Design a protein with these regions (language model features):
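Cyclophilin-like peptidyl-prolyl cis-trans isomerases
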Residues: 12-184
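Bacterial N-terminal signal peptides that target proteins for export
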Residues: 1-9
Length: 184
């Protein structure tokens, strides 16, 4: 009995350590439509996660809006005020597409211009699986673990062209705050 315990106990601790190591940083995005909990994958997207968290920690996203909403595609935010004015962002980061993470429903990825290494603060959350975005090298860095119904609600709002931005919600969908989740 003691010999079995001596073998099993280290195994239990080792498995617990692996589980802890695999858990990524979690953030809670409070929006005017509800909360979205997102797990970030530091192991596969360290540059994107570090960049995103630098904006989170600076409270940059507080008061910004989802400015591009396309049902059956994605919801995009993280850079514009409710008046559709772009906030000044930090320099762009290196693209981490091809890291094994896919643009599947509920994944969060860096929005960018045509230039591969042009992502700054803006991100999008996939409303559906979008494998074409993997081919186009859009870098995923996490996934929604709670609140996918909020993503669905945001994707369902009426949109139009507002101040030159197509697919903008007619009523602003505000990102109230994004914070690191409390660890237990």
């Amino acid at each position: 009995m003691m010999r079995a315990l001596a073998v099993l106990l280290p195994l239990v601790f080792a498995l617990a350590a692996v589980e802890t190591a695999q858990a990524g940083v979690v953030v809670v995005m409070k929006t005017s439509k509800g909360d979205i909990t997102i797990e970030l994958d530091e192991a596969k997207a360290p540059i994107s996660v570090k960049n995103f968290l630098s904006y989170v920690d600076a409270k940059f996203y507080d008061g910004t809006v989802f400015h591009r909403v396309i049902p059956g595609f994605m919801i995009q935010g993280g850079g514009l005020t409710p008046d559709m004015v772009e906030k000044p962002a930090k320099p762009p980061i290196r693209n981490e597409a091809g890291n094994g993470l896919k643009n599947n429903r509920g994944s969060i990825a860096m929005a960018r211009m045509q230039e591969l290494n042009s992502a700054t603060s803006q991100f999008y959350i996939n409303h559906v699986d979008n494998p074409n975005l993997d081919t186009m090298k859009y870098a995923v860095f996490g996934r929604v673990v709670k609140g996918i119904e909020v993503v669905d609600a945001i994707a369902a709002v009426p949109t139009g062209t507002i101040k030159g931005y197509a697919d903008a919600p007619r009523q602003p969908i505000t990102i109230v705050s994004v914070r690191r989740a409390e660890t237990k």
